Amino acid sequence: MESLNGCVLSQLRQSGAQVTRTLQKIQSRSYSAPVSGSIPAAKKKYVPTSGTYPLGFSASGINVGVKPKNTTKPDVCLVASDRPCAAAAVFTKNKFQAAPVTFSRSLLQKKGNQGIQGVVVNSGCANAVTGKGGLEDAGKMAQAADECFGQSESTLVMSTGVIGQRLPIEKITSNIPRAHKAMGSTHDHWLTAAKAICTTDTFPKLISRSFKLPSSPSVEYRIAGMTKGAGMIHPNMATLLGIIATDAPVSSTVLPAVLKHAVDRSFNSITIDGDTSTNDTVALLANGAAGGKEVVANTPDYDAFQTVLTDFSTDLAKLIVRDGEGATKFVTIRVVEAASEEAARKIASTIARSPLVKTALYGKDANWGRILCATGYSLVSEPGLPVNDVSEVVPEKTNVSFIPTDGTAELKLLVNGEPEQVDEARAAEILELEDLEILVRLGTGDKQATYWTCDYSHEYITINGDYRT
């Protein structure tokens, strides 16, 4: 009898092991965390091998060991101009604003968005919820950079990393002169700087391009930008840093409005996990080194630069979504035929951050009911309160489709509130693609909005569960 029981137990163990292996196989996906800081093969295509950088600007990234375990990765970055710049920045709306946010906001207000020379950034420690001492540390970082530039009160500060810990400030400030000496204007200098601001990012995010303005058709202007962020990403803004520099002569009087317009349509239209960080900052510096007529309000140059900056910011923001923690998909959410742009944005945002939608996409499941569910509750003010008359969403007029990125016809899931007979094989083909668009037609107006998001995978939990270790 003991032998028989042993045999049965052995078979059960083998069956259990087989089930475990089967489940592991089912649950596995194409994402895998980078090894030893290497860039995943699928992400290498997003890292530029050359660039066109604005005149008068230089950049650097060095390792100082903000985190004691980091002995190789760059973690302090400098981006600066050889002359004072007009500058503007958009900051997080989180009530617990980090010390560098408070410092940089105050500096821009004091200087009237003028006379800014550069930006100093550290990764590995957010310097957030660190009290008066943290604010003093942000000031010390700026002062160390100012001394290198031969200026005073001319440096913005950014930090990213773990919240609630003080910076190893002496280690940082004593090495800022070394970062200054390492500055240069080549592509490698800019790319190293972009690497220095990363935390859980799997690849550095850097874009550069040239453009023209109507009043100076013979002048080639340049714009370059770097950003970071892979988690705690949600509008207004997220654990997201962005530095954009241009050699166009943009007036300090219009720079804040131009930047806000661009950010609202780019960095404030992405979400990874719905969390808004304490440190979010996107800064724009314009030094006018390329010459030409100053860009001021109510001119063709203003409109042209606004378009350039918005398109540029959108491309930068999309890189953040493509590097979402554990993400395997890049998803565009488009809500059209809405009664108002505000309603369209709210619905798109709600769909984009829905855990049920995001996990269904990861599982390659055409569960359009989750999309419809998010659409239905998105404009209800608060759970538990009586539902208001939400006239912006009329079930009988609502349509939902998958739009393939390979150029083939859309797959209709819901038409005028009635479910379609879904071709599951076709749906599976679409959901196998890395890029996907979800289109919601409301049929209640002519406004629209677009959000970009990614899926949720098992790795998202692993990355964030291990973040402080």
Curated annotation (Swiss-Prot):
One of its GO terms (cellular component) is mitochondrial matrix. Gene3D superfamilies: arginine biosynthesis bifunctional protein suprefamily (3.30.2330.10), ArgJ beta chain, C-terminal domain (3.10.20.340), L-amino peptidase D-ALA esterase/amidase (3.60.70.12). The record marks 238-239 as: Cleavage. The keyword Mitochondrion applies. It catalyses: N(2)-acetyl-L-ornithine + L-glutamate = N-acetyl-L-glutamate + L-ornithine; L-glutamate + acetyl-CoA = N-acetyl-L-glutamate + CoA + H(+). The keyword Cytoplasm does not apply. The alpha and beta chains are autoproteolytically processed from a single precursor protein within the mitochondrion. Substrate binds at residues 199, 228, 239, 325, 464, 469. The record marks 160-161 as: Involved in the stabilization of negative charge on the oxyanion by the formation of the oxyanion hole. GO terms for molecular function: glutamate N-acetyltransferase activity; L-glutamate N-acetyltransferase activity. Pathway: Amino-acid biosynthesis; L-arginine biosynthesis; L-ornithine and N-acetyl-L-glutamate from L-glutamate and N(2)-acetyl-L-ornithine (cyclic): step 1/1; Amino-acid biosynthesis; L-arginine biosynthesis; N(2)-acetyl-L-ornithine from L-glutamate: step 1/4. Heterodimer of an alpha and a beta chain. This is Arginine biosynthesis bifunctional protein ArgJ, mitochondrial. It comes from Neurospora crassa (strain ATCC 24698 / 74-OR23-1A / CBS 708.71 / DSM 1257 / FGSC 987).
